[in-house]
């Protein structure tokens, strides 16, 4: 009985080991992002609205896929956040500006390190160099949030590796706002007409949905099959051991009956001798 339980437990652990690597496939650097990014809203509220933060902005963030600008953008965010950190004193309060910025710098530095590890696999360089600009806290951390969100889907977006070239007919870039929504990414604007641009955007959206569905299927199917195989092995082993258990119980009952008969015969002989 103990051997059967041990085998079932082994099957369960085997399923967990097979399933665990599959649940971490989305986002090559998403595990570097901690919950400290949620303090961005508090930081924006603490800073003056007219305070200007210098950032070398990568052109094309609003019209190019994230793999075209994320590598350079995260490096520039690291520089700007470090400069911003130097302007605040080291206050021990948990939610002070210094502590929040310090945590954000650590997150961005980890992302820079991760991007260096995957620089040749999933990212490209923009065709234009970053441009120094001045941003209010709301706009600056809107760019920060968009960059952080881009890491969560970087593996999906980078799978097609489209060219990182900004069309000459691209519209002016819109201001980024602090938001927790997914990054809003458009394909390169076509030079022909607005109608062609709309159709290409629709195709991009449908392809993204199909990619997400395919990835979930790739995760769910192996997990399902490993679960079925694990239970099949467990059932087979239990069925194989069941006859042995039945024979063991029968032999035990026979031995008990033989012992009882022997005891009765022994008592009968003792009675006859008396």
Swiss-Prot record:
<comment type="similarity">
    <text>Belongs to the SCF family.</text>
</comment>
<keyword id="KW-0964">Secreted</keyword>
<keyword id="KW-0130">Cell adhesion</keyword>
<keyword id="KW-0339">Growth factor</keyword>
<feature type="signal peptide">
    <location>
        <begin position="1"/>
        <end position="25"/>
    </location>
</feature>
<dbReference type="GO" id="GO:0005737">
    <property type="term" value="C:cytoplasm"/>
</dbReference>
<keyword id="KW-1003">Cell membrane</keyword>
<keyword id="KW-0812">Transmembrane</keyword>
<keyword id="KW-0873">Pyrrolidone carboxylic acid</keyword>
<keyword id="KW-0325">Glycoprotein</keyword>
<keyword id="KW-1133">Transmembrane helix</keyword>
<keyword id="KW-1015">Disulfide bond</keyword>
<dbReference type="InterPro" id="IPR009079">
    <property type="entry name" value="4_helix_cytokine-like_core"/>
</dbReference>
<feature type="modified residue" description="Pyrrolidone carboxylic acid">
    <location>
        <position position="26"/>
    </location>
</feature>
<keyword id="KW-0206">Cytoskeleton</keyword>
<dbReference type="GO" id="GO:0030175">
    <property type="term" value="C:filopodium"/>
</dbReference>
<dbReference type="GO" id="GO:0007155">
    <property type="term" value="P:cell adhesion"/>
</dbReference>
<feature type="disulfide bond">
    <location>
        <begin position="29"/>
        <end position="114"/>
    </location>
</feature>
<dbReference type="GO" id="GO:0005576">
    <property type="term" value="C:extracellular region"/>
</dbReference>
<keyword id="KW-0963">Cytoplasm</keyword>
<dbReference type="Pfam" id="PF02404">
    <property type="entry name" value="SCF"/>
</dbReference>
<feature type="disulfide bond">
    <location>
        <begin position="68"/>
        <end position="164"/>
    </location>
</feature>
<dbReference type="GO" id="GO:0005856">
    <property type="term" value="C:cytoskeleton"/>
</dbReference>
<comment type="subunit">
    <text>Homodimer, non-covalently linked.</text>
</comment>
<dbReference type="GO" id="GO:0008284">
    <property type="term" value="P:positive regulation of cell population proliferation"/>
</dbReference>
<keyword id="KW-0732">Signal</keyword>
<comment type="function">
    <text>Stimulates the proliferation of mast cells. Able to augment the proliferation of both myeloid and lymphoid hematopoietic progenitors in bone marrow culture. Also mediates cell-cell adhesion. Acts synergistically with other cytokines, probably interleukins.</text>
</comment>
<dbReference type="GO" id="GO:0005886">
    <property type="term" value="C:plasma membrane"/>
</dbReference>
<feature type="transmembrane region" description="Helical">
    <location>
        <begin position="216"/>
        <end position="238"/>
    </location>
</feature>
<feature type="glycosylation site" description="N-linked (GlcNAc...) asparagine">
    <location>
        <position position="196"/>
    </location>
</feature>
<feature type="glycosylation site" description="N-linked (GlcNAc...) asparagine">
    <location>
        <position position="90"/>
    </location>
</feature>
<dbReference type="GO" id="GO:0005125">
    <property type="term" value="F:cytokine activity"/>
</dbReference>
<keyword id="KW-0472">Membrane</keyword>
<feature type="topological domain" description="Extracellular">
    <location>
        <begin position="26"/>
        <end position="215"/>
    </location>
</feature>
<dbReference type="InterPro" id="IPR003452">
    <property type="entry name" value="SCF"/>
</dbReference>
<keyword id="KW-0966">Cell projection</keyword>
<dbReference type="GO" id="GO:0030027">
    <property type="term" value="C:lamellipodium"/>
</dbReference>
<protein>
    <recommendedName>
        <fullName>Kit ligand</fullName>
    </recommendedName>
</protein>
<feature type="glycosylation site" description="N-linked (GlcNAc...) asparagine">
    <location>
        <position position="145"/>
    </location>
</feature>
<dbReference type="GO" id="GO:0009891">
    <property type="term" value="P:positive regulation of biosynthetic process"/>
</dbReference>
<dbReference type="GO" id="GO:0005173">
    <property type="term" value="F:stem cell factor receptor binding"/>
</dbReference>
<dbReference type="GO" id="GO:0008083">
    <property type="term" value="F:growth factor activity"/>
</dbReference>
């Amino acid at each position: 009985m103990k051997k059967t339980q041990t085998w079932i437990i082994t099957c369960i652990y085997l399923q967990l080991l097979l399933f665990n690597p599959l649940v971490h496939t989305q986002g090559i650097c998403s595990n570097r992002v901690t919950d400290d990014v949620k303090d961005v809203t508090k930081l924006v509220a603490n800073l003056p609205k007219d305070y200007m933060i210098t950032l070398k902005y990568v052109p094309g963030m609003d019209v190019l896929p994230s793999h075209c600008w994320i590598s350079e953008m995260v490096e520039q965010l690291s520089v700007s956040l470090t400069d911003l950190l130097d302007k605040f004193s080291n206050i021990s309060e948990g939610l002070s500006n210094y502590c929040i910025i310090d945590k954000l710098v650590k997150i961005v530095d980890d992302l820079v390190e991760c991007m260096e590890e995957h620089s040749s696999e999933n990212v490209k360089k923009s065709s234009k160099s970053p441009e120094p600009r001045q941003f209010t806290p709301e706009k600056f951390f809107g760019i920060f949030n968009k960059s952080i969100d881009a890491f969560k889907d970087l593996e999906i977006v980078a799978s097609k590796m489209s060219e990182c070239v900004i069309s000459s007919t691209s519209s002016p870039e819109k201001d980024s706002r602090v938001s927790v929504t997914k990054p809003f990414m458009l394909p390169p604007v076509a030079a022909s007409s607005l109608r062609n641009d709309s159709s290409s955007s629709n195709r991009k959206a449908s392809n993204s949905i199909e990619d997400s569905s395919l990835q979930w299927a790739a995760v769910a199917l192996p997990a399902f099959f490993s679960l079925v195989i694990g239970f099949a092995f467990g059932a087979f082993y239990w069925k194989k051991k069941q006859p042995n258990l039945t024979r063991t119980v029968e032999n035990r009952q026979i031995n008990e009956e033989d012992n009882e008969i022997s005891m009765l015969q022994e008592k009968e002989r003792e009675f006859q001798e008396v």
